[in-house]
From Swiss-Prot:
Chaperone involved in the maturation of iron-sulfur cluster-containing proteins. Has a low intrinsic ATPase activity which is markedly stimulated by HscB. Gene3D superfamilies: 1.20.1270.10, 3.30.420.40, Actin, Chain A, domain 4, Substrate Binding Domain Of DNAk, Chain A, domain 1. InterPro entries: ATPase_NBD, Heat_shock_70_CS, HSP70_C_sf, HSP70_peptide-bd_sf, Hsp_70_fam, ISC_FeS_clus_asmbl_HscA. Pfam families: HSP70 (PF00012). The lineage of its organism: Bacteria, Pseudomonadati, Pseudomonadota, Gammaproteobacteria, Alteromonadales. It comes from Shewanella piezotolerans (strain WP3 / JCM 13877). One of its GO terms (biological process) is iron-sulfur cluster assembly. GO terms for molecular function: ATP binding; ATP hydrolysis activity; ATP-dependent protein folding chaperone; unfolded protein binding. PANTHER family: HEAT SHOCK PROTEIN 70KDA. This is Chaperone protein HscA homolog.
Length: 620
């Protein structure tokens, strides 16, 4: 399926040049930018061949330093070196300060209670800090790709709320780039592995980064990623593994008190040991202490595994809770995706494999997998992948509607409507006392349901039992930027409602869309005739239904010859309604209307008499 180049059948959409777009993983610890080049998605390196950019910003009186330059001063100038700003996004200062963690920054609350950092550069908020991280990534991309970006896809945690997502968009706006889409990080990882095309089922995304652990349980159904549950620990990550090794070194070397410089050296060596034990069973730690003594220690993978075992088991417990929250079992999980550098640790991979009962996906660099998925999405959104199996629409390719009586289609959202979009229409009941209404959502340009594509069916229960036509049901079609359709039906007086979600683009190729459009044009005249016939048949059924109810209630008001005339006209209408002569049905409806005019007048007189019965002139 292709990103739609909308054109009428028989015409060709204008070709376009390759458009520049990238995916950005705006991470808590590190950030990356990726792009699709020559059909392959990969992260982009800076001038020093470094792919990751530490998410660290240092503010001095004269300059703003980002990445490794800023990180180098994190111990010397912690007050003005902001790390993990992602944790501050969309949160109030009260919320931040009420937590157990203390921060070296000088804070001030904004007018709406959000945190502001006081720096030598003045006051900056988390959005501005995030923008300062985004800026070098955008510059790197434009320099590497050789042009101006048309847009970016930025990844965010699945649990980010609207305020946090909006803050991320505003950070991009400060840099001057267009956000094509905010993409959930676990969804990006799944896209990188191609899990969005073809497969259906439950996917677990295990994300163990430097400072945080996240587990996301996704359900993939007909092209739609639904987040079933999320969990994790915002204070557990690979950094904790490093600190455990650091403590082990200090204990083995009897270092009771260490300087800030030695402490940092121990931590750096701990990270090297952790990385070495990923591929080796043993390695040696070497550190020079404050007195110039060279300290050495052999560390085995078994020793390291024993140290971190409790922490790894803690992540598995989070996985168990997330599955329970999602209401699924490990047997239902078809794939487990590993994200984050700390998932390289063999014990982590082993425990995850044991828990889910299958080998996790690790072929893509876990540090880069989210950015790569975002790049694939960005490339599609700007129209660079005409053969993509992902159909991500910026317009509605075929009209969306609902079935009405007689098998007719009431179009709610017309084709070529730009998305996101919301449209609503009101419907009513057909019969007296009707307490439920079945809805059939369809797609296509034809006038009858039988000629359109069925998308979904659902039922609204709890409608008040009123006379036919008295209940008002508002049906809202909402299509988001990802082409996901939500249809909500709500009875207005009670507020009772039901909702269903569907992806209209799933399983639909450009060729099929073109064929459906051509069919609608070729059959337009016949379809209109069939629709007019169906409408008259529905009108006839409605007239006969309401008249039968009226005769059952007030038939005694008629003389025998009057009743016979009406029944004869009703029988004729019922007979013609089964045939295919629209004009004859319309004539029969008019004839029945003429035959019942005296009956309608008698019913009105009788109703007035009953209403006035027992009333005096003075009370009227």
């Amino acid at each position: 399926m292709a990103l739609l180049q909308i054109a009428e059948p028989g015409l060709t959409a204008a070709p376009h040049q390759h458009r520049l777009a990238v995916g950005i993983d705006l991470g808590t610890t590190n950030s990356l930018v990726a792009a699709v080049r020559s059909g392959v998605a990969n992260t982009l390196a800076d001038e020093s061949a470094q792919h990751s950019l530490p998410s660290v910003v240092r503010y001095t009186q004269d300059s703003v330093f980002v990445g490794r330059e800023a990180e180098a001063f994190s111990a010397q100038d912690p007050q003005n070196t902001i790390i993990s700003v992602k944790r501050f996004m969309g949160r109030s200062l009260d919320d931040i300060q009420s937590g157990s963690q203390t921060f070296p920054y000088i804070f001030e609350a904004s007018d709406n209670g959000l945190p502001i950092f006081i720096t030598p550069q003045g006051k900056v908020n988390p959005i501005q800090v995030s923008a300062d991280i985004l800026k070098p990534l955008v510059e790197r991309a434009e320099s590497t790709l050789g042009g101006t970006l048309e847009g970016v896809v930025i990844t965010v945690p699945a649990y980010f709320d609207d305020a946090q997502r909006q803050g991320t968009k505003e950070a991009a706006a400060l840099v001057g780039v267009k956000v094509l889409r905010l993409l959930n990080e676990p969804t990006a990882a799944a896209i990188a592995y191609g899990l969005d095309s073809g497969q259906e089922g439950v996917i677990a995304v295990y994300d163990l980064g430097g400072g945080t652990f996240d587990i996301s349980i996704l359900r993939l159904n007909k092209g739609v990623f639904e987040v079933l549950a999320t969990g994790g620990d915002s204070a557990l990550g690979g950094d904790d593994f490093d600190h455990m090794l650091q403590a082990h070194f200090q204990q083995q070397w009897s270092l009771d008190e260490v300087s800030a410089g030695l402490s940092r050296m121990l931590l750096i060596e701990a990270r090297k040991v952790k990385e070495a034990l990923t591929d080796s069973d043993n390695t040696t730690a070497n550190v020079t202490d404050d007195n110039g003594n060279v300290l050495s220690l052999n560390v085995s993978r078994a020793t390291f595994d024993e140290m971190i075992s409790k922490l790894v088991k803690k992540t598995v417990s989070s996985c168990r809770r997330a599955l329970r929250d999602a209401g699924v079992s490990t047997d239902e999980v078809i794939e487990t995706v590993m994200v984050g550098g700390s998932t390289r640790v063999p014990l982590v991979r082993g425990e995850v494999a044991n828990f889910f009962g299958k080998t996790p996906l690790t072929s893509i660099d876990p540090d880069r997998v989210v950015a790569i998925g975002a790049a694939i999405q960005a490339d599609i959104l700007v129209g660079n992948k005409p053969d993509s199996d992902l159909l991500l629409l910026d317009v509605i390719p075929l009209s969306l509607g609902i079935e009405t009586m007689g098998g007719l289609v009431e179009k709610v959202v017309a084709r070529n409507t730009t998305i996101p979009v919301a449209r609503a229409q009101e419907f009513t009941t057909f019969k007296d006392g009707q307490t439920a209404m079945a809805f059939h959502v369809v797609q296509g340009e034809r006038e009858l349901v039988a000629d359109c594509r069925s998308l979904a069916r659902f039922t609204l229960n709890g409608i008040p039992p009123l006379a036919a036509g008295a209940a008002h049901i508002r049906v809202t079609f909402q299509v988001d930027a990802d082409g996901l359709l939500s249809v909500t039906a709500m009875e207005k007086s009670t507020g009772v409602k039901t909702t269903i979600q569907v992806k209209p683009s799933f399983g639909l190729s450009d060729a099929e869309i073109g064929s459906m459009l051509k069919d609608s044009m070729a059959n337009a005249k016949e379809d209109i005739s069939r629709r007019m016939l169906a409408e008259k048949q529905v009108e006839a059924a409605r007239v006969l239904e309401s008249l039968s109810a009226a005769l059952n209630k007030d038939g005694q008001l008629l003389a025998a010859n009057e009743l016979s005339a009406i029944q004869g006209a009703m029988a004729l209408l019922a007979q013609l309604a089964e045939e295919k002569d629209t004009d004859a049905i319309e004539d029969a409806i008019e004839a029945l209307d003429t035959a019942t005019q005296d009956f309608a007048a008698k019913r009105m007189d009788n109703s007035i008499k009953l209403a006035l019965k027992g009333q005096s002139v003075d009370n009227i």
